[in-house]
């Protein structure tokens, strides 16, 4: 049984991580919960029989009995400092995205992890969902030939419009977050996970709606000043005549477009926008050599948990206890971080930006439901 600690007991903890731990409760449990707001930490601790709530980080890190894994679920600008402090205390960390704010910060974290011999596990977990495990394996087997391009779109209006959002929506519209770091990151991990490291990017975009009004009942009517770009259109060159395009936005009231489409020289794969968050969900496949010449829905063997966030918890368990190769690596997360930061620079300068980091592409992990 993995003994987990949770730092940050806000919306993402309550909405996904805690239900995910409960769903996998025969293999993992929460023993310690930290938040600067005592009520939040206590609410999480009360969900587990032997958990303790903390508002002191020192006390949390000194939790009696220790912890096998600590989830860093704090706001994005805090990730680097929290992860470093937890690792320096000797613990293994699973951090929400992004790994840090800069590539240099991410490299510093990887150095600490290497000294501890405990690699950082980095969200998002898109590539370890059943769908994308299957897709990676399908492409590696030549199922539709050589991948040529990916077109991805992800967005909405951001958390200010989520009536049931539990946290503070303002941070998502400020420097250090925005749509690319909040949700575009999911598709960037898919694009690089399937096509490999990017070599160059060019982006256009900006602040299209400079003031937001919240729809969250407890904050209804409050105004948010947007200080970071809320729309990105990014072209990505992966080399070897392979390309990608990502549209990432907090200025998209709705859309009927697919969330993700991959084109290869003998076929295509499409994922509906209403399907993408279900990691066990179907993908539509088109093959040029299919006599019917039509789309076919393919559903992979399901994993015990299907959510994109929750799938990462399962992968962490299987990595720590079963020796499953780590797919959610710090190298891959750092590469995606550089792409996101390069997109911001490209908006400012109008230039194409060379990407300097890389990562070793991980082989597909077989889909297994046990």
Model-derived features: positions:
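C-terminal helix-rich "cap/oligomerization" subdomain common to oxidoreductases
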Residues: 69-71, 118, 316-370
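Active-site loop of classical SDR/Rossmann-like NAD(P)-dependent oxidoreductases
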Residues: 12, 36-39, 302-314
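Contiguous beta-strand/loop segments that form the cofactor/metal-binding neighborhood of enzyme cores
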Residues: 189-280, 312-322, 360-370
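Hydrophobic residues in well-ordered beta-strands that form the structural core
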Residues: 55, 95, 120-122, 246, ...
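Beta-loop-alpha module in the N-terminal Rossmann-like domain of NAD(P)-dependent dehydrogenases
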Residues: 48-112
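N-terminal Rossmann-like dinucleotide-binding module
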Residues: 1-48
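Rossmann-fold dehydrogenase core element
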Residues: 108-126, 145-150
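Predominantly a Rossmann-like dinucleotide-binding segment in NAD(P)-dependent oxidoreductases
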Residues: 126-225, 350
């Amino acid at each position: 049984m993995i003994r987990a600690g949770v730092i940050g007991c806000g919306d993402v903890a309550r909405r996904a991580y805690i239900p995910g731990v409960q769903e996998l409760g025969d293999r993992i449990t929460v023993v310690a919960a930290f938040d600067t707001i005592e009520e939040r930490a206590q609410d999480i601790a009360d969900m587990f029989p032997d958990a303790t709530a903390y508002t002191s980080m020192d006390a949390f890190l000194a939790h009696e009995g220790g912890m096998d894994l600590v989830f860093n679920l704090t706001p994005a600008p805090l990730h680097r400092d929290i992860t470093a402090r937890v690792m320096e205390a000797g613990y293994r960390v699973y951090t929400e995205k992004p790994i840090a704010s800069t590539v240099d910060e991410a490299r510093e974290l990887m150095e600490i992890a290497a000294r501890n011999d405990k690699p950082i596990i980095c969200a998002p977990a898109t590539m370890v969902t059943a769908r994308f495990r299957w897709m990676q394996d399908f492409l590696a087997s030549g199922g539709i030939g050589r991948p040529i391009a990916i077109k991805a779109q992800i967005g909405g209006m951001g958390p200010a419009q989520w009536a049931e959002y539990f946290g503070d929506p303002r941070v998502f519209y400020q420097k250090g977050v925005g749509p690319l770091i909040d949700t575009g990151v999911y598709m960037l991990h898919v694009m690089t996970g399937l096509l490999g490291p990017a070599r160059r990017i060019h982006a256009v975009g900006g602040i299209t709606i400079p003031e937001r009004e919240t729809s969250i009942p407890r904050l209804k009517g409050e105004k948010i000043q947007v200080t970071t770009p809320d729309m990105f259109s990014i072209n990505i060159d992966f080399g070897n005549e392979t390309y990608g395009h990502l549209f990432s936005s907090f200025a998209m009231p709705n859309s009927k477009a697919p969330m993700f489409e991959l084109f290869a020289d003998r076929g295509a794969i499409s994922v509906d926008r209403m399907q993408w968050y279900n990691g066990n969900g179907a993908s539509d496949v088109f093959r040029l050599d299919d006599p019917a010449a039509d789309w076919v829905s393919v559903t992979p063997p399901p994993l015990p948990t299907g959510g994109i966030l929750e799938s990462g918890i399962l992968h962490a368990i299987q990595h720590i206890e079963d020796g499953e190769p780590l797919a959610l690596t710090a190298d891959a997360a750092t590469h995606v971080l550089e792409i996101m930061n390069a997109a911001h620079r490209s908006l400012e300068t109008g230039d194409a930006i060379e990407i300097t980091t890389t990562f070793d592409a991980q082989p597909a992990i077989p889909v297994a439901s046990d």
